[in-house]
Amino acid sequence: MNNKKYKLQAAIGLAVLGGLIGSGSVQAGGFSTPTYGAPGWGRAFGGGSLFKNDPSAAFNNPAAMAFIDRNIAHLTVDYARIKMKYKGNAYDFRGDPATTLPVDGDGNPGDASVPLDGNGGQGGFTAWLPTGFMVMPINDRFAFGLSQVVPMGMRSTWDQNGSKLRDFAVDTKIETVGLTGSLSYKVRDDFAVGGGLIVQRSQGFVSQNLNLTGAAALSPGLGGAIDFPSGVGSNLMRVKVDNTSVGWFTGVVWKPTDRDTLGLNYHAKIKNKMEGHYNIYADATGRGQMTVKLPNLGNKTLVEAAYPGLKLFPDGAKASAELDIPATVGLDWVHVFDDRFTMGASMLWTQWSSFKDLTLKSQGNTIVSIPYKYKDTMMYSLGGDYRFTDRLTLRAGVAFDETPTRDSTRDPRIPDNDRWFTSLGFGYDIKAIPGLTIDGAYSRQFVKEAKLKTVNQDRLGGSRLDGKVNAKGEVVSLSATYSF
């Protein structure tokens, strides 16, 4: 290949990845997001990034880059559609069916409470998720990789008005977008090591109604001295926080035979303290409970008297929350049966037990701390490629993913449970453009029914849910890979 032609093809490859990095990222379904291209989705992630010339190794297992024999740029766009429905009941702190007492613009309560009888509508979402990888061999021993990935992301959106879920969750969104650089070294012809760094931008958004009168009725500060009703008015709290953090990852790859490849990878836990702002969109009654100092309460607001040390500002204040990215360990195996059929299997352990609670702080004080007590999980996957013709490759796979949630602390923000993935995919080499391959995949998620026995913290009003969420999801993935 002459130098001019090489430079042109290199420019095309860089443009593919550069165009992706310059685009906006979007939220995908699930707290933990698979970081593969369409070929990986088609195999349900079986074999990880150990298949021949898979550029997703740049993030998933950088050691595998040492066995990639050409420059590769890859762009994937995923379309995710997640559906969630709640069915069940909600109760106030007394155990009565949940209600709300409307108030007018002057803070005057209505004549009667209104039942909260809505089930929150459709809690799911649709989204587009771009992912990109690039691998460049430096010589016969070293290779360098770049990627843009979304390792963490989840979203739920429930109705606010008349909803049984309004005191537990309205909108929730967590997204982490990372840019990575990695390097691999082939120690021997059958063994390689690799490692890399990730710089990630995390954003979090949560909102829910604050049941201030219910919280006052349960408060230690007032000691039950006043018989407050539950659910008076509307006080929608919105919290938006973000952070930039740095982490690292590493991996090893061993080829014990000319047909087998084994890989082990580790992605370290990343400390992630997010900071931002909160606002409370309160009616006249709620605003008064947060701002008006009452002589009979020691010249404190109702909120301050109910929970000493707690201050809420309806016009907003600074906020912070810590949501660390858990460590993972992945073990992958790929076996080449013949020149047409290749099979892969994987296991992924995630240290979700590091996520114990979600604590919101402001100006040195804890507004609320919600326990989650997640447990460590395993994901098992099996998938493969069948080269149907010299240009067409067919793929299929199945995976089982354990949930980190517990029945005792699961809530509508993340109503997760164990799930199965089933996937189909294809790859086609474009004859008119040598080096260009188009891949596609369809993946369906079957999620076990999630029970919700959530009890709110006292300072959130002490409401209780008794119901279940049924969820299902599907992902359509399309990618372009250019080798040069």
Name what the model sees in each region.
Residues 67, 74, 79-83, 122-126, ...:
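Generic, well-ordered alpha-helical segments
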Residues 1-27:
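Gram-negative bacterial Sec-dependent N-terminal signal peptides
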Residues 32-47, 66-85:
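Transmembrane beta-strand segments of Gram-negative outer membrane beta-barrel proteins
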